[in-house]
C-alpha cells in the first residue's frame, strides 16, 4: 500500500508571494515534490518550466482558461455559443501542459448563463459539454494527456456552476466513454454538496484521476479547524489504492 503523494496548489498556497516562479521556489523549499496551478497563463511556459526544474518540482495539473472573467465566465466547456473559445483555450492549455510536462488538464465546465434557468438550459448545456469533451478527448489523446472533470459546489462557492455533483460528472463521463477523461475529486466540494464521503470515495475512486482537499467550511488547510477528519480520509484513500496526487 503506497503512501499518498501531495502536490502544492499554487493558486491557494503562498499567496503572499508575487508570481508563480516565486511560489514554485517556496513549494520546493517546503519539501513538495509536485505542484498544481489553475491558470498558469500569465507567465511564459518556458519560464515556469525552468523555475519548476530549478525547484525540483513536477507540475501535475493545470486548468483550461476561464474565459472572460470580467463577464462572469468561469470555464467554457458547457457554455452554449462558446465552443470555439473553449477549443482555443484547450489548445493553449495543451501547449502549456506539453512545455511543463504536465499530464492532466482540468476541463472547466463553466457557469449557467446569467439570467438563465438552470433546469431549462441543462439539456442544451450537457449536449454542448459532451461535444466539447469528445473533441477534447481526441486532442488530448494525441499528446498522451488526461482531461479531468471537477464538480464545484453550488451551495457556497459558485451557485451558477453547471457541473456540481460527482453523480452528474460520472454520468457525463459514461456518456462520453473515453478512457483519457476522468473525474477530479475535490473533497471540499463533495462534502458541501452531498456528504457521504466514504461511500462516494469508494464508488467513484475507480474513475478519479486527481484529488484535491481543503477543510470545510473555511477552505483552509486540512489541519485547520473544521468538520472533515482528514487522517481518516487520507487513510481511506490509501486503503482504496489511490495512486494519484492529492492537491
Q: What do the predicted segments below correspond to?
A:
Residues 22-24, 49-52, 119-123, 161-164, ...:
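Short, glycine/charged-enriched secondary-structure capping and boundary segments
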Residues 1-102, 123-124, 174, 178-182, ...:
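N-terminal pre-domain/capping segments
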Residues 163, 174-180, 191-247:
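Glycoside hydrolase catalytic-domain groove-lining segments
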Residues 39, 153, 187-189:
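Short, glycine/acidic-enriched loop or turn micro-motifs at the edges of active sites
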Residues 24-25, 45-49, 90-94, 130-137, ...:
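Generic structural signal for well-ordered alpha-helices
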